[in-house]
Amino acid sequence: MSELNKLPPYMQILFNKIYQNKILTALFDDERIVKLAHFGIKKKIMKDLLRDVAKNAHVLQIGLTFGDEIDCIYQKVKKLGKLDVFDVSALQLEYAKNKYERKNIELANYNAALPWDEKYDVVICYNLLHELPLQTRRQVMDNVLNSLAMGGKAIFVDYAKPVWWQLLRYPLFVFNRLYRPFCESLWQQPLENFSSKKDGFRWQHSYYGGKLWQKTIAVPKILSNEDVKKLTKLFRGK
């Protein structure tokens, strides 16, 4: 097995029972289960996500997802654009080949912690970052940002820190401690802080369900912060 095809250790330890199990994969792929796991707010998240994807966009998604999320992206770009998907699980990719066999979706067994050459108009990480160890998360986010074409954007949909009145805040805290050890870090700081490239991008945050979820968009800055300061001084005659 090549370096590109190896299943990362964190996947083998934490998620092997789900992502390497055909029966559980089929169960969790049921859209009703997916909507339940989104606490009833997936429709709003997807509506906003699709608004951020142009019909002629060349899109890359990092990681396969359960439910109809990838199909919704495909339906948006199928006539004028293109959709590629990376994943590290051979079983999930095999399942996806059958699931999307009639759709022109390019599936690749590739670890996004390693850089790639192709540039994209939109790169999506949907419900992925909370599964990644901090170093891997930084590598993936940096590679995503490096792969944006001119005028491109990166879209990260993931968990956030729920507001104090959100009834699910405390059950989720306990669940994360037990089963999702890397998720709690998303409660502790803005998502952009996990990337070493953050200063070269502008970040826009949207929240859903009392901050159960976030959609964070990164777009490259045309001018750096230092350039803006210099121009401001110039216009003010300083």
Identify the residue ranges that each predicted region occupies.
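A conserved beta-strand element that flanks and buttresses the S-adenosyl-L-methionine
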Residues: 124
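Core SAM-dependent methyltransferase catalytic element
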Residues: 199-238
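A short glycine-rich, Lys/Arg-flanked "PGG" loop and its adjoining helix->strand segment in the class I
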Residues: 138-150
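Class I SAM-dependent methyltransferase SAM/SAH-binding core
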Residues: 60-113
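C-terminal alpha-helical "lid/dimerization" subdomain adjacent to the S-adenosyl-L-methionine
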Residues: 156-198, 203-213
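Conserved alpha-helix/loop element of class I SAM-dependent methyltransferases that forms part
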Residues: 37-56, 68, 72
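Class I SAM-dependent methyltransferase Rossmann-like catalytic core
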Residues: 6-48
